[in-house]
Structure formats: structure tokens, C-alpha cells
Design a protein with these regions (language model features):
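Recognition helices and adjacent regulatory flanks at domain boundaries
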Residues: 22-23, 30
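An acidic, carboxylate-rich microenvironment
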Residues: 15-18, 34, 89
Length: 130
């Protein structure tokens, strides 16, 4: 089994939330009304300044292709196969050692913990001050 979070590639000058919104639409065809930060991590602190923000997008709405601003899926985006997987199943796959992507694990376990707390501790989806 392979599972990954959407990993937006920054466009120069684009805010992280704007990038996440654009990538969600381009790669899945969905738009979200509700965005929060699940995690803010450095992959390799001490050796890299690469910062990864993991967002939670909720209240999703399907956007017909005709309304997607002319984006045409190419390369890997055209090959993506989306499916809904219950969160508890994904957690079980990580705990069983079936899944290994570190950033995806951070996101999965963060949303699992947030859901157990009723999503009350989530932060606004804005870039934290550096």
C-alpha cells in the first residue's frame, strides 16, 4: 500500500495556504471551506531549514473540471487514483509497518489526535511567524 499527503511545490511568492488550496484543487478536484494547521515541522533540523506545514482541509466541495481555471492534469497528476480510506485504517497500517512516509505519518497521527480532542486545539491556517 502506498499513501501520501499532497505535497505542494511552492510557486515563487505564493503563501503556503494558497499553495495548499491550489494543489488540493489541481490534484483532487476538491475545494475546502475549512483549513487548519495540523503540524509545522522541520524534516531534518540542524541540517536543513526546510519547513513543512501540514494542513487539514475540511468541508470539501467537488469542483467540476470546467470551473478549475484551465488546469490540465499531466504526468503524475494524471495518474493519481484517489480513494477515501477511513482514518483508523490508515493509523492501523502505520502501526503495522505497512506505511513508511514520515510526513504522511505526522499528518495522519496529528489528525487522529485532533479528532479525539474534537478538533478544538487546531491552529488557524496561517503561516506562523519565523
Amino acid at each position: 500500500m502506498q499513501l501520501r499527503l499532497l505535497v505542494p511545490r511552492d510557486a515563487p511568492g505564493e503563501e503556503p495556504l494558497v499553495t495548499a488550496e491550489r494543489e488540493l484543487l489541481e490534484e483532487t478536484g476538491y475545494r475546502a471551506r475549512d483549513w487548519h494547521v495540523l503540524a509545522d515541522v522541520f524534516n531534518t533540523p540542524g541540517t536543513s531549514r526546510e519547513r513543512v506545514l501540514v494542513f487539514l482541509a475540511r468541508d470539501l466541495t467537488w469542483v467540476p473540471e470546467s470551473e478549475r481555471a484551465g488546469f490540465v492534469p499531466r504526468h503524475e497528476e494524471a495518474q493519481l487514483q484517489l480513494r477515501w480510506v477511513p482514518l483508523t485504517d490508515v493509523v492501523s497500517h502505520f502501526l503495522a509497518g505497512d506505511l513508511h512516509n514520515g510526513i504522511t505519518a505526522v499528518g495522519v497521527f496529528a489528525v487522529h489526535a485532533a479528532r479525539q480532542g474534537g478538533f478544538t486545539a487546531l491552529r488557524e491556517a496561517v503561516l506562523p511567524q519565523r
